[in-house]
């Protein structure tokens, strides 16, 4: 099972979201810990992956050799790709 770690930026972005959305993001991250590659999509031109949660996106850096899912950034889809 993978462990989940957050960057400082991702932590700040998470706490800026509404409480209901925060809980939804954390619940989905907890569910993907077992098989993360089943739920994500590769972000073009980068080594990162995208997890879609409604209208929000979570940018992930996955290290399969260490079993770590590193959350680099998250937010609403209209702002996350800038």
Describe each model-derived feature in a short phrase.
Residues 28-51:
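A short, surface-exposed loop/turn module that caps and links secondary-structure elements
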Residues 1-5, 9-12, 16, 20-23, ...:
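Enriched for short, Lys/Arg-rich terminal
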């Amino acid at each position: 099972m993978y462990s989940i770690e957050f960057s400082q930026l991702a932590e700040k972005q998470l706490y800026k979201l509404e409480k209901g959305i925060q809980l939804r993001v954390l619940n989905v991250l907890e569910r993907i810990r077992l098989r993360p590659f089943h739920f994500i999509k590769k972000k073009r031109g980068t080594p990162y992956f995208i997890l879609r949660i409604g209208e929000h996106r979570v940018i992930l850096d996955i290290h399969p050799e260490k079993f770590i899912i590193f959350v680099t950034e998250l937010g609403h889809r209209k702002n996350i790709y800038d």
